[in-house]
């Protein structure tokens, strides 16, 4: 793992090359990151060339696994795309700089907000409904604001992968893996001796197709676990874009309604909160 000063030095150099002046990053704080990623917050020394007072620096070390390492390019493109959106549709932080060779991203600092997981854990029934309503509104604004922009996202992805051998194929393979997992899930259930009705098989087949094409397509981070959603200034922001892209937006809705099935600590939702979420979306 690179030591902290080296990662921060790289980030300062990236910002200097992009914005001019001589950027300095101090008061470095290590943050929680997903997987092997190193994530830091740093304060920016006052500089007329750069208006942000603090930034978040993320480094994703190469693992040697092509499929795993391809996530960095996807995340970079997703942040490029999200940054180009209007503030009302933008799902999360702004991309301030990056270096694909060093595998470093620099994004705006959202501050010390609480995660959706923390908010749900502390909520009573009424607050729970308000939280889900606010989440539905945030998702709906992102989906509505990006529904017609898939070509723009694809152009950015093509530019990023064009000069990198096999990179485009790896991105397509990662998308197909999501569809493949549905088939695996059906096989696992069947292997456990559970009878699968024909209607469920048909639904699973339809879902596989809608992951890759058709449906109500919009931009989504697609990893909507409550610890990847942060609330600041009374608004929700979505983090971690390693699986981001254009997919049927109803997958995001279903993921919330199903109580975040990939996040075992999620609080069960009551019917009123679920209805409020869907109505707001």
Where are the model-predicted features located?
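Inter-helical turn/loop segments and adjacent helix faces that build the functional surface
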Residues: 149, 189-195, 263-269
């Amino acid at each position: 793992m690179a030591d902290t000063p080296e990662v921060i030095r790289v980030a300062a150099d990236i910002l200097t090359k992009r914005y001019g002046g001589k950027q300095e990053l101090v008061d470095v704080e290590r943050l929680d990151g997903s997987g092997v990623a190193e994530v830091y917050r740093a304060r920016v020394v006052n500089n007329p060339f750069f208006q942000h007072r603090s930034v978040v620096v993320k480094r994703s070390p190469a693992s040697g696994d092509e499929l795993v390492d391809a996530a960095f390019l996807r995340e970079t493109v997703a942040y490029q795309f999200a940054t180009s959106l209007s503030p009302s549709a933008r799902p999360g932080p702004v991309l301030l700089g990056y270096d694909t060779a060093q595998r470093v991203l620099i994004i705006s600092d959202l501050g010390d907000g609480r995660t959706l997981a923390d908010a749900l854990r502390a909520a009573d029934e009424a607050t729970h409904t308000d939280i889900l309503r606010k989440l539905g509104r945030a998702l709906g604004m992102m989906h509505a604001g990006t529904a017609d922009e898939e070509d723009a996202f694809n152009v950015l992805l093509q530019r990023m992968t064009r000069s990198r051998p096999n990179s485009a194929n790896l991105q397509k393979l990662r998308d197909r893996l999501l569809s493949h997992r549905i088939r695996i899930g059906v096989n696992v259930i069947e292997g456990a001796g559970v009878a699968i009705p024909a209607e469920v098989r048909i639904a699973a087949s339809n879902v596989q197709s809608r992951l890759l094409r058709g449906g109500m397509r919009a931009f989504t981070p697609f990893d909507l676990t409550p610890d990847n959603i942060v609330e600041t200034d009374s608004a929700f922001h979505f983090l971690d874009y390693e699986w981001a892209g254009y997919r049927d937006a109803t997958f995001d809705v279903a993921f919330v309604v199903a109580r975040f099935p990939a996040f075992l600590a999620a609080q069960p939702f009551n019917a009123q909160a679920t209805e409020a979420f869907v109505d707001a979306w």
